[in-house]
From Swiss-Prot:
SUPFAM superfamilies: Winged helix' DNA-binding domain. A motif (SMAD interaction motif (SIM)) lies at residues 428-448. Residues 339-465 are annotated as: SMAD-interaction domain (SID). The gene is foxh1. Transcriptional activator. Activates an activin response element (ARE). Recognizes and binds to the DNA sequence 5'-TGT[GT][GT]ATT-3'. Modulator of nodal signaling required for organizer formation. Also required for the development of dorsal axial structures and left-right symmetry. The lineage of its organism: Eukaryota, Metazoa, Chordata, Craniata, Vertebrata. This is Forkhead box protein H1. Disruption phenotype: Fishes exhibit ventral body curvature, reduced spacing of the eyes, and absence or reduction of ventral neuroectoderm, including the floor plate. CDD domains: FH_FOXH. PROSITE patterns: FORK_HEAD_2 (PS00658), FORK_HEAD_3 (PS50039). The FM region is required for binding smad2/smad4 complexes. FM2 is more effective than FM1 and only interacts with phosphorylated smad2 that is in an activated smad complex. GO terms for cellular component: chromatin; nucleus; transcription regulator complex. It holds the Pfam family Forkhead. Residues 36-56, 211-246, 261-360 are annotated as: Disordered.
Length: 472
């Protein structure tokens, strides 16, 4: 007995041709329908037909799932192509932005106008004509132009109708003196780096046509914050015209001037004689020196007067003014070239007597050792220098005659006096230990009431012939 397998659906699996989706579904439905009809006809005669129908159905579903997975993988590419071909286009085309600031472009179009003023609509039109970036439907740059016109003070609004300050149609002008020069240069952008010959490096020549650029001569902001240094040609008005001019700000004398009182402003001029520099012939004063100094009238201490105070303030000022004029002519470049010693002083430096030692206002360091109260100003404990003239605190009242006489020591009496030679050997250690602060060595040497001086002959033997003029 020969066994018969079902129809072609059982003997061979159904063949599905891969094609378009509609045709594949049509054939699949037809095969499924054909298998169902065969299964219903031969169910009784062949029980294996039911199994063949299930195999046919499962095979078709598997192939259909494979197709759907394949279609899913190909779907996004097909959708992207469809969207790209039928997508919405942009409503404007962007050109590369020019490598200049809005301030530079606005100032350039205003300065190149015939009347040097434009309205807002004219500015927008001129900028869009020069640069294609501002053409098309892109309108965002117009707000940037309005912002720059109202932000920078170099743009000035000229009212079309003064009675309507908020009206439209006003003109805009440029004040070239207020334009920041750093904003006129070409910016470092991708367009400017591609071809540097297309765009000008600086728009200043197109803006300052017929104008001078005053901002170039102005100093930088860090330099403008520094105080101006006084010069010989233009001294500041607050400066004393009679004070000596110093070339170096950090000179020692410039630091000393800040510590000295106003009455001793010309102290450095008076001590120039110690360096042995003679006065120029053209700066010698023709007027005789005044016998007394005006500053001595209000002085009660000998230490407030310089030991070299043999010249009045007025004479020194006159000499200083002459020295200034000669210094401007390029005669000398020394810090003390504006001053000269008085004509009656000798430039030859001899042995310094004790009363010519430096005081608290001199350039030299004064002794600052403080003596005990029992040793102050008694004149006896340290050295018996009775012949040295001394103006003490407990002496007689100073009269007008004391201020006329010795140029080096203006408080001596004007009459003839006898002079005794002081001892040549002096104990400087004991002298320095007993000197009060800000006082000279001479202030602590003599007694309070001794005003007798050595004879001229003995005094000349010690100090040489240069001091013979002290005898009256």
């Amino acid at each position: 007995m020969t066994k018969h397998w079902g129809g072609p659906g059982l003997l061979a699996p159904p063949v599905i041709t891969v094609g378009e989706g509609a045709q594949r579904d049509h054939h699949l439905d037809c095969r499924i329908g054909y298998s169902s009809s065969k299964r219903s006809c031969h169910r009784s005669s062949n029980p294996l037909l039911e199994l063949g129908g299930r195999l046919d159905k499962s095979t078709g579903m598997a192939q259909d799932s494979c197709y759907r997975a394949k279609a899913t993988n190909q779907g996004p590419w097909e959708l992207q192509d469809g969207n790209s071909s039928g997508g919405k286009k942009k409503n404007y085309q962007r050109y590369p932005k020019p490598p200049y600031s809005y301030l530079a472009m606005i100032a350039m179009v205003i300065q190149n106008s015939p009347e040097k003023k434009l309205t807002l609509s004219e500015i927008l039109k001129e900028i869009s004509t020069l640069f294609p970036f501002f053409k098309g439907n892109y309108k965002g740059w117009r707000d940037s132009v309005r912002h720059n016109l109202s932000s920078y003070d170099c743009f000035v609004k000229v009212l079309k109708d003064p009675g309507k300050p908020q009206g439209k149609g006003n003109f805009w002008t440029v004040e070239v003196n207020r334009i920041p020069l750093e904003l006129l240069k070409r910016q470092n952008t991708a367009v400017s780096r591609q071809d540097e010959t297309i765009f000008a490096q600086d728009l200043a020549p197109y803006i300052f046509q017929g104008y001078s650029q005053p901002n170039k001569s102005k100093p930088l902001p860090p330099e403008s914050s520094l105080p101006p240094v006084p010069t010989r040609q233009s001294p500041p008005p607050s400066e004393d015209p009679y004070r000596p001019k110093l070339d170096s700000t950090f000179a020692i004398d410039s630091l000393l001037h800040s510590l000295r009182p106003a009455s001793s402003a010309g102290e450095g001029l008076r001590e120039r004689e110690s360096w042995g520099v003679g006065p120029p012939p053209h700066t010698r004063s023709t007027t005789p020196p005044r016998p007394c100094n005006a500053s001595y009238n209000g002085s009660s201490s000998a230490s407030s007067v310089s030991p070299a105070s043999d010249f009045s303030d007025e004479d020194w000022r006159g000499v200083t003014v002459v020295g200034k004029r000669s210094g401007d002519r390029g005669i000398t470049s020394d810090a003390y070239s504006d001053s000269c010693p008085p004509p009656n002083k000798s430039s030859k430096r001899g042995n310094t007597p004790p009363w010519e030692l430096p005081t608290s206002y001199a350039k030299y360091t004064p002794p600052n050792a403080v003596a005990p109260p029992s040793m102050r100003f008694n004149g006896n404990p340290f050295m018996p220098l009775g012949g040295i003239p001394f103006y003490g605190y407990g002496g007689a009242h100073v009269t007008t005659s004391h201020l006329i006489g010795h140029p080096y020591w203006p408080i001596l009496p004007s009459g003839p006096v006898s002079i005794q030679a002081p001892p040549l050997l002096m104990d400087l250690d004991s002298m320095l230990q007993s000197v009060p602060p800000n006082k000279s060595v001479f202030d602590a040497l003599g007694s309070n009431n001794q005003t007798v001086h050595p004879s001229p002959n003995q005094y000349a033997l010690q100090n040489g012939p240069s001091l013979c003029k002290y005898s009256l």
